[in-house]
């Protein structure tokens, strides 16, 4: 669903044709975040900022889909609990209405210092292994800070809707639980399962860990909505919602964003295998910039996921509107979603400037590089997720040189960049034949708009 369709649909939902009578409010409203990766009091402020936004939205509950802590320390959970207490003292709204915690754990809560150089980072910041959650009774710490027992499977009901979760160390238990208790769930309305990892072969992009458990538990249950985190993939990517035998939704990250595989400006972990580190990486873990979350509103006939850019305090992207009952319509099955999504286009008169320079790659090594500069492909709220650069020899054969993500692929509409730069080694260019460079703007499903082309060039 593109933004124009969403606005029309929202207007139809919001008021009846006769007399403009406002539609009833949602039955349920839930704030959703994941992967806060709290290290210290400063990083906990981002979580608190999201909580304040959720409070102002009047949510009934707040869902945290795991990786509350980054290094897996007791202090991180304490900072999170203190932030919650400042915003929702006594688990209540200012008007006294109860706000339900829907929290679970992720891999970093159990083993955060095992990744990359996080142990060194933790020690350098004045924290100690002596406060690792796993060495201080993680179950007891959960009850201490979040006020509930640490159980393998947790079920709560909010405004008549069921929410079920499993902790990181029990992420394989849901299939057995559904076999035993699934019949107790009301199949006339949606229910929600959330875990840190995403269901395999749904919204995952090479990073999951679910091992097919959620598919076994929920396939053939169209009223199930499964929400996961872990991948840090942006909510501007349409692959972060999927519909098949159930509905799966990614919760993105409140710490940093990651790119899918295949981009020259991704960090090395996600870049193409044949890339040579010519382009600087877009901000990722080590820069921890854009923080994303959602507000989910449940109505009788739809679920609306409003996406938020908490860094820039603005709407992130077009909301997802899931019709109910989900069995009758699956607009977010990948094929249907791709077909309905508009393709981006460059502004009229856009040009690409191409030049060769002697520069340096990420390792600081001298490199002869092709540099392309061109305007962002933005028209209204339709914008490019990435750009594909192709070499087009005069003989007619085409070769994909590289794909680069938009520098603001994970930011709100209001903060879309004006210009894009692509950099790659001249070793990717044909030698001794005339060629042109073509730049295609693409949406998140890889569907491309009309290209802009450079003047004819020749490599010696």
Where are these regions (language model features)?
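N-terminal export signals
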Residues: 4-22
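N-terminal active-site segment of His-dependent metallophosphoesterases
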Residues: 21-78
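Active-site neighborhood of phospho(di)ester-bond hydrolases with catalytic His/Asp-centered motifs
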Residues: 32-34, 62-67, 100-107, 192-196, ...
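Extended active-site neighborhood of metal-dependent phosphoesterases/phosphodiesterases
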Residues: 74-180, 185-187, 213, 217-222, ...
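Short acidic, glycine-rich surface-loop motifs adjacent to enzyme active sites
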Residues: 186-203
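A short C-terminal boundary segment appended to hydrolase-like catalytic domains
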Residues: 274-403, 451-452, 457-458
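Recognizes extended acidic, P/S/T-rich segments that occur
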Residues: 386-430
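Beta-strand-rich modules
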Residues: 429-446
